[in-house]
């Protein structure tokens, strides 16, 4: 059984408008993700080392009739942290209770969840880096000793009562592991970083999802979607659904490479997975600032986006792919993006390369 405490996230218009955004866009998309989500480790594609480790740790815990050690999953959004939490609970044969760091505002919120857990249950806390210090303090003894201290009464009559908890497994997920406090991080026995997926791994995911959606697709069509999915299963599944729509209306319903290419071209997703916002940022650096170096505030003014949006939403993938470089003097367009856009690299690039090395 799965119980979920809902959190309504702040609306990020830039992400809502981007088909290649790694964040979940709506409740409807969350429901579709759940339908496509693998239920067992045997069905989980990618993250080979993590999968192998979890298979061993879960089997060992089950053999000893113990709860699994607490698990911390971190990495960029859309890579399968929530999916793995659900799989851990399914493989252990226990219930999963799901909540989110920002939802747990008071110590009582966490205490209410912990005291209702059954032995060996899995508690999944998404965005665990956003736990308040007060809640985090309550969590420490719960993780170590399976006990919590709660205050009863107020003022001089207040007293502390220690409550025993059933053994349970906390699975924490975060996109910002660096924001976790050391005491909290140290209480996780299993720590795993999720990496971006290869195109071949995403091809398998697209093929599996297409089968579940009853969408006919050939291997070349799967690969065309996969290679534009920015290494992220969530994006791959979203693109698949949009390509399926295109195939049903503009073609015969079968997703071939040509159909996928035409659909993704319509969506402004190029062969490298860049969308119109990515190209807008890179074009501004190249056309308006000579390829850089240029400060992020100047870029923000040039393209009409907030600084935080550029740093948190647009830049990470461009930097990871080697199209953009951050230096002390500002952002620089790399030779790779000139090649991708079919532009001649200016002679000043040599000077910029020297600046980038400083």
Curated annotation (Swiss-Prot):
Mg(2+) binds at residue 82. ATP binds at residues 36-37, 78, 81-83, 144-146, 187, 197, 234. Its EC number is 3.6.4.-. DNA binds at residues 307, 326, 331. Keywords: ATP-binding, Cytoplasm, DNA damage, DNA recombination, DNA repair, DNA-binding, Hydrolase, Nucleotide-binding. It comes from the Bacteria. GO terms for cellular component: cytoplasm; Holliday junction resolvase complex. Transmembrane segments: none annotated. The RuvA-RuvB-RuvC complex processes Holliday junction (HJ) DNA during genetic recombination and DNA repair, while the RuvA-RuvB complex plays an important role in the rescue of blocked DNA replication forks via replication fork reversal (RFR). RuvA specifically binds to HJ cruciform DNA, conferring on it an open structure. The RuvB hexamer acts as an ATP-dependent pump, pulling dsDNA into and through the RuvAB complex. RuvB forms 2 homohexamers on either side of HJ DNA bound by 1 or 2 RuvA tetramers; 4 subunits per hexamer contact DNA at a time. Has 3 domains, the large (RuvB-L) and small ATPase (RuvB-S) domains and the C-terminal head (RuvB-H) domain. The head domain binds DNA, while the ATPase domains jointly bind ATP, ADP or are empty depending on the state of the subunit in the translocation cycle. During a single DNA translocation step the structure of each domain remains the same, but their relative positions change. This is Holliday junction branch migration complex subunit RuvB.
């Amino acid at each position: 059984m799965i119980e979920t405490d809902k959190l309504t996230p702040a609306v990020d218009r830039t992400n809502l408008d981007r088909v290649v955004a790694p964040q979940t866009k709506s409740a409807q998309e969350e429901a579709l993700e759940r339908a496509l989500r693998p239920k067992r480790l045997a069905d989980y594609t990618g993250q080979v080392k993590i999968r192998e480790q979890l298979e061993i740790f879960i089997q060992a815990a089950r053999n000893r009739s113990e709860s699994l050690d607490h698990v911390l999953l971190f990495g960029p959004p859309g890579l399968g942290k929530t999916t793995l939490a659900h799989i851990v609970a399914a493989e252990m044969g226990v219930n999963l209770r799901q909540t989110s760091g920002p939802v747990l505002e008071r110590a009582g919120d966490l205490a209410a969840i912990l005291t209702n857990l059954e032995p060996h249950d899995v508690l999944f806390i998404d965005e665990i880096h956003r736990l308040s210090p007060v809640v985090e303090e309550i969590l420490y003894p719960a993780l170590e000793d399976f006990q919590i201290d709660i205050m009863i009464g107020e003022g001089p009559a207040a007293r502390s009562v220690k409550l025993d908890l059933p053994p349970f497994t906390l699975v924490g997920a975060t996109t910002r592991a660096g924001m976790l406090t050391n005491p909290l991080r140290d209480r996780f026995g299993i720590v795993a970083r999720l990496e971006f997926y290869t195109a071949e791994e995403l091809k398998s995911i697209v093929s599996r999802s297409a089968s579940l959606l009853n969408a006919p697709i050939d291997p070349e069509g799967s690969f065309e979607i996969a290679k534009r999915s920015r290494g992220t299963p969530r994006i791959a599944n979203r693109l698949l659904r949009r390509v399926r729509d295109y195939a049903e209306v503009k073609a015969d319903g079968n997703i071939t490479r040509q159909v996928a290419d035409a659909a993704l071209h319509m969506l402004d997703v190029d062969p490298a997975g860049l969308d119109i916002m990515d190209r807008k940022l890179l074009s501004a650096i190249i056309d308006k600032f000579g390829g850089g170096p240029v400060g992020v505030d100047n870029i923000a003014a040039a393209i009409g986006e907030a600084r935080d949006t550029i740093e948190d939403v647009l830049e990470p993938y461009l930097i990871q792919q080697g199209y953009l470089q951050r230096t002390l003097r500002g952002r620089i367009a790399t030779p790779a993006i000139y090649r991708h856009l079919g532009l001649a690299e200016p002679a000043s690039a040599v000077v910029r390369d020297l600046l980038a090395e400083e």
